[in-house]
């Protein structure tokens, strides 16, 4: 099984032959990036402990009513949005008809299935048969506007690859101008990496 959901600690462990990509949900609405690296068979670490550990350097108070030690700005949000929480470069930035440019995407639900959907009008990875790939779709929603974002993670376990894509659903009843919408941000917590970038 390439994607393992742990109901108890609300984590998704996406596993290839040699790597793990781990995402978790805290406070029922915040989707966090927890780990990407060497394969981990089971992930049982307390998410709140990790979030507080990464809190060093935060300069504003907590915005979580039930947990004064958590600060949105210090969390490694899986899909950061402009104007909210994560202070790094956002993956998503939209402008609404009323002039607002702030989006707060909350975790809604998930679904896991065999196979990978095509991306209409765009080139993308594919599998010869559905058994070669497993996909996790996570739905996020802005409670104020109704805008939905679906994050897709397709795990090609035998090929050591995870293909990510994002689908944006405008359910706001208004025109929305997308200023930025990228498929992924990945936090690298260890500094011992070599980065190779191919322009084109």
What name fits each language-model region?
Residues 24-26:
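Contiguous, structured surface segment used for ligand recognition
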Residues 21:
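Gly/serine-rich nucleotide phosphate-binding loop at the start of the catalytic core
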Residues 10-13, 31-200:
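Polysaccharide-binding surfaces and accessory modules of carbohydrate-active proteins
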Residues 1-11:
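Short, Gly/Pro- and small/polar-rich lid/capping loops
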